Amino acid sequence: MRLADTRPPFAGLANLSEAALAALPTPCYLLDEARLRRNGEILLGVQQRTGCKILLAQKAFSNYDLYPVLAPYLAGTEASGLYESRLGREELPEKENHVFCAAYRADQFEELLQYADHIVFNSPHQLAKFGPAAKAAGKSVGLRVNPEYSTQEGHEIYDPCAPGSRLGTTRAQWDAAAAQHPDLPDLLDGLHFHTLCEQDSDALATTLPALEAKFGDLLPRMKWLNFGGGHHITRPDYDLATLEKCITGTQEKYGVQVYLEPGEAWALNAGYLVTTVLDTLQNGETHLAILDMSAACHTPDVIEMPYRPPLLDAGEPGEKPCTFRLGGPTCLAGDVVGDYSFAAPLTEGDRLIFGDMAIYSTCKNNTFNGMPLPDIWVLHENGTTQPLARFGYHDFKYRLGSPR
């Protein structure tokens, strides 16, 4: 395609021909192999320069058909529970397998031990309950800590350090538990903290002193320290130098292996959602377009966060001559992607392409209101496209009851 829109979320579309675009069904997710590889190269560079290990947080990107593209660059996978841990073991069997869960189930823990190498607990109680079994199975055991230092602004739903947070152990909680169970520290091989969300390394640089103030006395006994996720390392303006200084400084000071587990950084700007305009209408002064994709079903973070995703060749409201409010076909009044402006009025049949749609999309979508799931395609580095998954009525029905 000849691109007038040079923003990073659409850079990979230069490899896509107009004919290939026209042949795609809609709605569909299109995953960009070249952009995934480019992100992997950046993350591998950080690992090579610092000696840290960077994991793929599968909660953000779980499209395992593309794991072979990322495999040369990642140290392993990070899971949030049994199924993600199993996926990582099945698809990347030679890589490290880490798992953190806010609370593990007793009836699943034995199976989890078959997949995970590192198991991180959320509370001293869970550490005491499951830690001995994990150690006996030869696993590396960690505890997620809460440094009680917030760096979030504008989307507190993603702030693990908010008052009353259920995520991570505070120092007061740890001290109380260790006083009752003096052998608890002996179970630990490492500490884990996850406090960031789509942030630059300056937030990490201010978080580390807070972590040290709360838990620095424990670090000399640890083998590793996991910096968690939320590091937007592959964003064009990300400050790599500060990140690498934080990593090397921590490793040298405490003699620990540093891990990072970003999700978005691996697949940032590496996917698109292609959709078709089904209808246009006007309500008062507002021009509306109904698409065959749904914000509520296919891009739920648009509503949950909320945020307005980038759209190819579109501007801010009023920036270009024709402004439209884009929404989905469901019955939810709030199923709205946002307001965008265009050089010409939208018409039925127009194709639109949302950018940065590889992350928190396929792994979070749903079939509310009977909405079909978008197909998943890949854009190969040579410009060809290939279907990875097609969905239909049975995918909707059999989530709701017995197959018959």
Language-model segments: residues:
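N-terminal capping/small domains of soluble enzymes
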Residues: 5-104, 108, 294, 342-355, ...
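A short small-residue
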Residues: 18-24, 190-194, 228
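Active-site-proximal beta-alpha core segment in soluble small-molecule metabolic enzymes
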Residues: 49-224, 246-249
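Feature marks short, surface-exposed loop/turn motifs that line or immediately flank catalytic pockets
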Residues: 149-151, 197, 233, 266, ...
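Glycine-rich beta-strand-to-loop/alpha-helix junction loops that act as flexible
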Residues: 194-196, 225-234, 262-265
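Charged helix-capping and loop-helix junction motifs
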Residues: 205-210, 239-245, 275, 341
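Charged (often Lys/Glu-rich) extended helix/loop segments that serve as interaction or gating elements
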Residues: 246, 257-404
